[in-house]
Amino acid sequence: LSILEKKMIQFASVRCSEDAWQKRTKSARMVFRQVREMKEIMIATSNAHKVEEFTQMLAPLGYQVRSLLDLEEAIDIEENGTTFEENALIKARAAHERLHTAVISDDSGLAVDAMDGAPGVYSARFLGYDTDYATKNQYIIDQVKDKERGAQFVCAIGYVAEDGSEHVFTGIVRGEIAPQISGEKGFGYDPIFYYPPYHATLAEVSEEQKNAVSHRGRALAKLIAFLKGEGQ
């Protein structure tokens, strides 16, 4: 349900005196006005976790957030870019062309120095979609054995405004490939990404600690700063 629908159901479900009714009518009008004034923004993802994260960041700025989960028909988007930035804009551009509204999309992954930046944009499908991350992580550890262990998580957020103008914001967190898989928190490549300031992998720290330095958080901060300036 939309914000408006939820508010109106709540409004209609309460029986009250004439005085209270007038107050609630005034409140309902304010809700209508607030919803009309809200700017809509589409998150080009079907990942519920990402939708929640973006919503928490954008709602305070007056945005009504929607996602691909709200659409009756799926949008098929081929991510064929060679960089995170290209893929982020490809997804945002495709959704904008279909929906004609402001769109945000992101692409992220792990880039290992000793592997010439791999798995990079292929992080999700590295060694095949059906390969579990324990296998992927051990493979990377074996590849960097006795080599440079530097690595970075990268997140690029593509933003296509309602008028079609395009922008991209990149967040990076540097670290090292751990000598062994460590930690049971997080997901993906977190158990092998050692973050020196924490003296631990990202799978060994709390979600709050991870989010404080995450690549997505850093990219989001840049997007938020831009949107705040755009609204002035």
Question: Residue locations for each model-derived region?
Answer:
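Short hydrophobic alpha-helical segments enriched in small aliphatic residues
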Residues: 12-14, 20, 28
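Polybasic, lysine-rich low-complexity intrinsically disordered segments
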Residues: 6-8, 23-27
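Short, Lys/Arg-enriched N-terminal segments with co-localized hydrophobic residues
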Residues: 26-37, 229
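Anionic-ligand binding patches
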Residues: 39-42, 48-232
